[in-house]
Amino acid sequence: MSRVCQVTGKRPMSGNNRSHALNATKRRFLPNLHSHRFWVESEKRFVTLRVSVKGMRVIDKKGIDAVLAELRTRGEKY
């Protein structure tokens, strides 16, 4: 399963670790992903999404029905 937020589309990004001597070694910054069950009142069922914490805040703001409608238009499975 890829490390991508289903709501925001956040993906891992690359950067550098920096030692005290400022040596650079490549590393990945991973999104803060969680598999979370959301209750969808209109469908009377739970939906499991793999979302970042930012994605959870978006769901709190817009509502789960609006977010699921966006996912459907993108053709994403949930």
Curated annotation (Swiss-Prot):
Pfam families, sorted: Ribosomal_L28
Keyword 4Fe-4S assigned: no
Gene responsible for this protein: rpmB
Similarity comment: Belongs to the bacterial ribosomal protein bL28 family.
Domain of life according to the entry: Bacteria
Residue segments, region Disordered: 1-21
Name assigned to this protein: Large ribosomal subunit protein bL28
Species, as recorded: Photorhabdus laumondii subsp. laumondii (strain DSM 15139 / CIP 105565 / TT01) (Photorhabdus luminescens subsp. laumondii)
Keyword vocabulary terms for this entry: Ribonucleoprotein, Ribosomal protein
Record NCBIfam families: L28
GO CC annotation: cytosolic large ribosomal subunit
An example Gene Ontology biological process: translation
